């Protein structure tokens, strides 16, 4: 069941792994169940039948219908899109860096995005839209700078990319701390709230751009998925097999950075999902390939589960989703280290 099978349709041939396909179906089912639970969770609790009727516009309670369609559904869809983007981006970063702990932090995107947001908040007292745009621009510039600094001659190796990313991230982290202590209390609190990441007050204006961004980037990632697997054999072996190593690596880095930018613009920086999603997906599928699709589904499931847990634990005030994912991520890392007997 773990082997590779071929599905032939005339002149077309599609390779697939039965276990990976089954895992994706299971993850999709779990995600739908969590989404349904979230649509019924809140100050106005709703049953599955009421949620379904409200989604179809046939609810008997107009207030419940408005809450489901205008408040809860955009939040749930944003969580799905953000989780999927981070999960697939994490799978790409882990493959490129040859590091199971790889994430967007590897090339400093998250720290760079935080720097852009903090500068806008502390120095310019900007609102949410300007803050998100500044975070996007700063994150992309940071990622580009790391890639350029990591180039040695015509190539940017995976380990060199990691080391340069760690150095740039550490420098920006110090700058962020300096900016936070120089701002007034209100600005610092707002900056910290943005840095925590949140799904609160998400609307359709957050859903549509994220959906369009993923619609453009996911096909590119899946198209280069096979080449990404070949890159894991090493640059020399991949080049001998006809893969344009540096071009494919740069293209995949840009795709992964774009996905992370989409997620950051929609919900702010969210920890843990890009790290754990691909790892858990690989354990579930037991596949040697890069878990792009299963990693995306696992990321969506993890973020939905974290949001549901946060709402169940705090009915009075919704906890920032970044806080919940950070807590889960800490326990996951401890479990991972204990399991591998590294401590």
What residues fall within each predicted segment?
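Alpha-helical transmembrane segments in inner-membrane proteins
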Residues: 1-343
